[in-house]
Swiss-Prot record:
Co-factor note (free text): Reduced FMN (FMNH(2)).
Amino acids binding NADP(+): 48, 54
Keywords carried by this UniProt record: Amino-acid biosynthesis, Aromatic amino acid biosynthesis, FAD, Flavoprotein, FMN, Lyase, NADP
Catalytic activity: 5-O-(1-carboxyvinyl)-3-phosphoshikimate = chorismate + phosphate
Protein's recorded name: Chorismate synthase
Cofactor: FMNH2
Gene name of this polypeptide: aroC
One MF term in the entry's GO annotations: chorismate synthase activity
Length: 371
């Protein structure tokens, strides 16, 4: 397979390029009978779409979704759900020079070497524009999981460049363009981005994503562990260079006496595992963190070569996000939802008739707090 499909029983296949006429996804495996409208999907697309603040690309895409199939009289039919998002604000003239050149940090060289041809306009298939249909398809998963299990997803930015953003108040996340849970730091974040843009530079970010009310038992050891598939999906997001589950790399400096999450009849005492044990969900919150690299498209000149290997200087033109992490929160939520949906259906297929005398352990002890 050519890597355009995620999942085994709930699958999402995306198509399109950044400056093509449209982008989209086909979601297959959704159980029949769930109410679904374009308005349901639009809510999350609006959280991700470009041009919503001065700190992101000024490309103005409405990202209006069209449901082409798989829904009849407002209900899913159990057949493939095709979703289409038309591109309306392409400026392909900004990319005329890069057909013969390779932009440092971009996929240009790798795509050209692999395929022998590439669409240079806006990065073509490698553009973060292709995360829009992923977000759209994930609404199907989010809605079904919430109705079936009460599963909830949320994410937030915990670091912008060098600036750490301590978690303060979840109600603030949707009130600012950074998805930051700390209203006090918004002026500082805005100043930081303004200075970065004036310098013609970019920065990275760290995004946290959580899932609550996750059923226990999801995951297929050894090679389709739940956390392995989560990491696989998160690395499929543009510009992601690192993934942590639970304590992640902090596990290196922890002692076993600290890292192991104690089990009590009234709940887990901590969640260093991030919601999985042995690759199977424990019923605790899933805790995932992703590291996003600085945007490669910057105004500052950088050295590169052209198709013939001749040295050149590349200075990127066009409309770009100085930090792609600013719009990454709904994308990370989407990937987590897609993986969970797939594993729920896989678990039902294999273990629906399994009965156990074990009582489920609550996700956390009363009074404990895990963001």
């Amino acid at each position: 397979m050519s890597g355009n499909t995620l999942g085994l029983l709930f699958t999402v296949t995306t198509f399109g390029e950044s400056h093509g006429p449209a982008i989209g996804a086909v979601a297959d495996g959704c159980p029949p009978g769930m109410l679904l409208t374009e308005a349901d999907i639009q809510l999350d697309l609006d959280r991700r779409k470009p041009g919503t603040s001065r700190h992101v690309t000024q490309r103005k895409e409405e990202d209006k979704v069209e449901i082409l199939s798989g829904v009849f009289e407002g209900k899913t039919t159990g057949t493939p759900i095709a979703l289409l998002i038309r591109n309306t604000d392409q400026r392909s003239q900004d990319y005329g020079d890069i057909l013969q050149t390779f932009r440092p940090g971009h996929a240009d060289y790798a795509y050209q070497y692999k395929y022998g041809i590439r669409d240079p306009r806006g990065g073509g298939r490698s553009s973060a524009r292709l995360t829009a249909p992923v977000v759209a398809a994930a609404v199907i998963a989010k809605k079904w999981l919430h109705e079936k299990y009460g599963t909830e997803f949320y994410g937030y930015m915990s670091q912008l460049g060098e600036l750490e953003i301590p978690f303060k108040d979840a109600s603030e996340i949707e009130k600012n363009p950074f998805f930051a849970a700390n209203a006090e730091l918004i002026p500082q974040l805005e100043t930081y981005m303004d200075e970065l843009r004036r310098a013609g530079d970019s920065c990275g970010a760290r995004i946290e994503v959580r899932a609550r009310n996750v059923p226990a038992g999801l995951g297929e050891p050894l090679f389709d562990k739940l956390d392995a598939d989560i990491a696989h999906a998160m690395m499929g997001i543009n510009a992601v260079k690192g993934v942590e589950i639970g304590a992640g790399f902090r596990s290196v400096v922890q002692r076993g006496s600290e890292h192991g999450d104690e089990l009590h009849s009234d709940g887990f005492a901590s969640n260093n595992s991030g919601g999985t044990l042995g690759g199977i969900s424990s019923g605790q919150d899933l805790r995932v963190s992703i590291a996003i690299k600085p945007t490669s498209s910057i105004m500052s000149p950088k050295q590169s070569v052209d198709l013939s290997g001749k040295p050149i200087i590349v200075q990127t033109k066009g409309r770009h996000d100085p930090c792609v992490g600013i719009r990454a929160t709904p994308i990370a939520e989407a990937m987590l939802a897609l993986v969970l949906m797939d594993h729920v259906l896989r678990h039902r297929a294999q273990c629906a008739d399994v009965s156990t005398s074990i009582s489920p352990i609550p996700a956390s002890q009363p009074g404990s707090f895990h963001d």
